[in-house]
């Protein structure tokens, strides 16, 4: 049982790290000395000087920002609730609330990555730009968060 709890906590912390990195790092779109993320657009000049400007104030970008932040909040709340339920839940009880919040975190990150993908159709045609590692980490966090949430829902507390 101790190994199961340790595995679940490691999976949850891994999801949290992926969500934080995907939200913070400026590597959602890369190419030709440019890097774009949710918060700023950066370009590197020939002298290796990096110039960054704030991202546009488009509604779709603000919705991506909000859903990524919500996914982090839901995941942190889920981890906190897991530890609370671990000590207060009766024997045989299930971690429903923890699982629901973790599934919500997964759905939020999926929504954010989907909106970001749909709103950039012009970059699909230009081979000079590609999706960066932070964008890929967001997509990797989605199934891991869902898996973690399902495990929480199925999990029963033992003595």
Swiss-Prot record:
It is found in: Cell membrane. Ubiquitinated by the DCX(DCAF13) E3 ubiquitin ligase complex, leading to its degradation. It is a multi-pass membrane protein. It comes from the Eukaryota. InterPro entries: PMP-22/EMP/MP20-like (IPR050579), PMP22 (IPR003936), PMP22/EMP/MP20/Claudin (IPR004031), PMP22_EMP_MP20 (IPR004032). One of its GO terms (biological process) is apoptotic process. It holds the Pfam family PMP22_Claudin. Keywords: Cell cycle, Cell membrane, Glycoprotein, Growth arrest, Membrane, Transmembrane, Transmembrane helix, Ubl conjugation. Might be involved in growth regulation, and in myelinization in the peripheral nervous system. This is Peripheral myelin protein 22. It comes from Equus caballus (Horse). The lineage of its organism: Eukaryota, Metazoa, Chordata, Craniata, Vertebrata.
């Amino acid at each position: 049982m101790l190994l199961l709890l340790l595995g679940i906590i490691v999976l949850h912390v891994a999801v949290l790290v992926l969500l934080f990195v995907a939200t913070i790092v400026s590597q959602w779109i890369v190419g030709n000395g440019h890097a774009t993320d949710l918060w700023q657009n950066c370009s590197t000049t020939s002298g290796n000087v990096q110039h960054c400007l704030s991202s546009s104030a488009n509604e779709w970008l603000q919705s991506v920002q909000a859903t990524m932040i919500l996914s982090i909040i839901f995941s942190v709340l889920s981890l906190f609730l897991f530890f609370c339920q671990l000590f207060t839940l009766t024997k045989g009880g299930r971690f429903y609330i923890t699982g629901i919040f973790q599934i919500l975190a997964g759905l939020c990150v999926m929504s954010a990555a989907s909106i970001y993908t749909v709103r950039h159709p012009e970059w699909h045609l230009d081979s000079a730009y590609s999706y960066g590692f932070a964008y890929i980490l967001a997509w990797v966090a989605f199934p891991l968060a869902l898996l973690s949430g399902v495990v929480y829902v199925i999990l029963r507390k033992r003595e």
